Design a protein with these regions (language model features):
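Non-heme Fe(II) oxygenase catalytic core, chiefly the N-lobe of the double-stranded beta-helix
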Residues: 2, 6-229, 266
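Catalytic core of Fe(II)/2-oxoglutarate
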Residues: 213-281
Length: 281
């Protein structure tokens, strides 16, 4: 429920159930299959934990330096797009990918950015089936691990990988609404400073053509969670899921969709897109 005294312009903090992995010793495996890799099988044990989730939008409005990519692992940026239809692959390739490259360079200071994939998600099952979209993910996770971050560079840029891996690189994702504001199932992100190294549990990610790794998370009451209420189409959430530097800056940013208990009845299903990039410095 909302914190007492929430009014327009006040922080819309809330409590919601976030689904964490249970460290039972059972291997965590997430396997995708079928056309478009939209079906999945999952092994392992998970459980919901009630967590406070803080309104980052109001805090950032009061202090523009409150959130940054290197301090917290994420930041929200104003980002108008020329894309008319996010479900048109040509518009994504020819318009949106270059927009994302410019944005990631701006936010991170990277000298080179490579877009390597995107995922469209919908909370509407019929739309997912018709357009081969994926569902929102309701388990706390980080998309890359100490091993799978560098491995992704080797897979995508094999001729350059060993030279590129001699210097700093990061994997940075850009997430946004594709149509109406996000009302149902928004995205929550954990402040990277609130993580402990033993919170991270390796999960094997199996695709038809390769095997990767992600991190699932053990519950830790010290985790500090944030979200941006009602994200608009002209905003982009930029967050870091891997950084090769180990100097104290944010390296991993666990995140998850969640059910906002105050979502109004009849709220439109969420539609979102995330783009994944390699950023070299």
């Amino acid at each position: 429920m909302n914190s007492p005294g929430n009014t327009p312009g006040a922080a819309r903090d809330l409590h919601a159930a976030l689904v964490y992995a249970l460290d039972t010793g059972e291997p965590l495996v997430n396997e995708t299959f079928a056309e478009g890799n939209v079906q999945r099988r999952v092994t392992g044990s998970y459980a919901p934990f009630e967590m406070p989730i803080h309104d980052a939008r109001v805090r950032a409005a009061a202090d523009p330096a409150a959130f940054s990519l290197d301090q917290n692992g994420f930041t929200l940026m104003p980002h108008a797009t020329q894309v008319a239809d996010f479900f048109d692959p040509l518009q994504l390739r020819d318009i949106y990918y270059p927009e994302v490259i410019a944005l990631v360079k701006q936010v991170s200071g990277a000298s080179r950015v490579v877009v390597f994939d995107h995922t469209l998600r919908s909370g509407n099952e019929q739309q997912r089936q018709q357009q081969l979209l994926r569902e929102p993910v309701f388990t706390v996770h980080n998309d890359y691990t100490e091993w799978s971050g560098p491995q992704r560079v080797r897979e995508l840029l094999p001729d350059e990988a060993e030279a590129l891996l001699q210097r700093r690189f990061a994997i940075i994702q850009v997430w946004r609404a594709v149509a109406q504001p996000i009302i149902a199932n928004p995205l929550a992100l954990a402040d990277a400073r609130s993580l402990a190294s033993d919170d991270l549990i390796i999960s094997e990610r199996r695709y038809p053509d390769r095997i990767g790794q992600t991190y699932r998370m053990r519950h830790n009451p010290a985790h500090r969670w944030y979200y941006y209420p009602q994200m608009q189409r002209h905003e982009a959430l930029v967050f870091k899921v891997y950084d090769s530097l180990t100097d104290g800056r944010a390296r991993f940013t666990p995140h998850t969709s969640f059910a906002d208990p105050d979502t109004p009845a009849g709220a439109p299903p969420r539609q979102s897109i995330e783009v994944r990039t390699l950023a070299f410095f």
